[in-house]
Amino acid sequence: LVEYYRLAYIRKPEFMGNTREEERDPAYRVVKDLPWDEATIRTRMGQFAQLYDQVGNCAAQVPEDRQTAYYHLIQYPVQAAAKMNEKALTAQLARHGLADWADADAAYDAIEALTDRYNQGKWKGMMNMAPRRLPVFQKYPHVQADAPLPAAPAIIAKWNAVDGKGRLTPCEGLGYEGGAAMLTPGESVSFNFSSDAAEAVVSVRMVPTHPVSSPQLRFTLSVDGSDPVELAYETYDRSEEWKENVLNNQAVRNQVVPLTGSGKHTVVITALD
């Protein structure tokens, strides 16, 4: 279940259609591509396929008198989420001619079958596979994309917060890879990397939250001892950035930094709030 929650942390099943329901513009209710490259999509599909099989195999070890409880509390949530991801991501690939629409439709049919089984058990008739009949839960229209998938980013180095050097407090279960950590105001964390490039983009990913003891959420970023650049990432309720943070479960700040010389470099992040 840890992996199930980790994948849902990155993107909840109900957000996989890249739709919104609070907007007045009906365009937000049209299923569309997520801003993911093909490799990211296929990796996530593989991770969910593995989860689907694992939770099904575990069912064989559950006593008969607990089969229904296991299915309702564990197997259905995991397998339905897996098929929801398979449906949405296969459809995205199909819009680009990279997958078969029949496979996306088959994933929808699988959710239907899983839900039918759920509704024959202890909590008979309780589960609705398409709350409010929202577009994200339906079979997706067979349409062609009007723009290509984004290219995979060129990553020089990648870390979780817990990989850094500093006075960090690990936050179990938070972060895309479960490696988030907290910095108290005034504390710093550093990371080392190697590159011969003249500049780089440092992308800092935070758990989206709101200010508590001050009006802002700020940190500074410095590379190779350069003057620190101050960045803030607080948002306001229902702002566009707030909405994106909720959907992605991340607050992101990108900063272009010059790299002096070649070889090894050090990034230092210091919390201000």
Regions found by a protein language model. Give the residues of each.
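Substrate-binding groove of N-acetylhexosamine-processing glycoside hydrolases
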Residues: 1-164, 197-201
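Extracytoplasmic
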Residues: 127, 131-273
